UniProtKB/Swiss-Prot annotation:
Origin species: Mycoplasmopsis agalactiae (strain NCTC 10123 / CIP 59.7 / PG2) (Mycoplasma agalactiae)
Record's catalysed reaction(s): pseudouridine(1915) in 23S rRNA + S-adenosyl-L-methionine = N(3)-methylpseudouridine(1915) in 23S rRNA + S-adenosyl-L-homocysteine + H(+)
Sequence similarity: Belongs to the RNA methyltransferase RlmH family.
Protein name as it appears in the record: Ribosomal RNA large subunit methyltransferase H
SUPFAM superfamilies, sorted: alpha/beta knot
Pfam families in alphabetical order: SPOUT_MTase
Chief site of localization: cytoplasm
GO molecular function, one term: rRNA (pseudouridine-N3-)-methyltransferase activity
Superkingdom per UniProt: Bacteria
Residue runs in coiled coils: none
Residues bound to S-adenosyl-L-methionine: L71, G100, F118, S119, Q120, M121, T122, F123
Length: 150
């Protein structure tokens, strides 16, 4: 069975958490899904120090031997069909999707990771978490020829 772990800096507010849980339940029919919410060092004034601290937590949370996908503005943009093919090509393997903090991550620690971007636009952090899990759900719907994706 495919294993997917979402590693995200920060936590969801209750209004986003219920939607996240709804998608997670649906995704759970197709894969083993887990989430690691990591501490955001919002009190840290030095952005580089903040990114280093958060990046260390991310690195510690990675699943061993998993395909690491960093969500980054510098990443490649793909559509939902291509995203579903990415998951299909790695069926029965492990993925770790990384959502860094509001200031990003120290990308030099993720040179071997695949980098994806959803857009050049900026999204609220909590909304992006929902967008990611929805795209994971959509990918499985595409792979199962569901009418969900039109």
């Amino acid at each position: 069975m495919t294993k997917i772990k979402i590693v995200a800096v920060g936590s969801l507010s209750p209004k986003f958490k219920s939607l996240d849980e709804e998608y997670a339940k649906q995704v759970g029919h197709f894969c083993s899904l887990s989430l690691s919410e990591l501490k955001e060092f919002s009190e840290e004034k030095n952005i580089e120090v903040k990114k280093e601290k958060e990046t260390k937590l991310i690195l510690d949370a990675l699943m061993p031997n998993s395909k690491v996908i960093l969500l980054s503005l510098k990443g490649k943009q793909i559509d939902s069909i291509a995203f579903s093919k990415l998951i299909e090509m790695n069926t029965n393997q492990s993925f770790t999707f990384i959502i860094g903090g509001s200031d990003g991550v120290c990308e030099e620690h993720f040179e071997s990771a695949q980098k994806l971007s959803f857009s050049q636009m900026t999204f609220p952090h909590q909304l992006f978490r929902i967008m990611l899990i929805e795209q994971i759900y959509r990918a499985f719907m595409i792979l199962n020829n569901s009418k969900y994706h039109k």
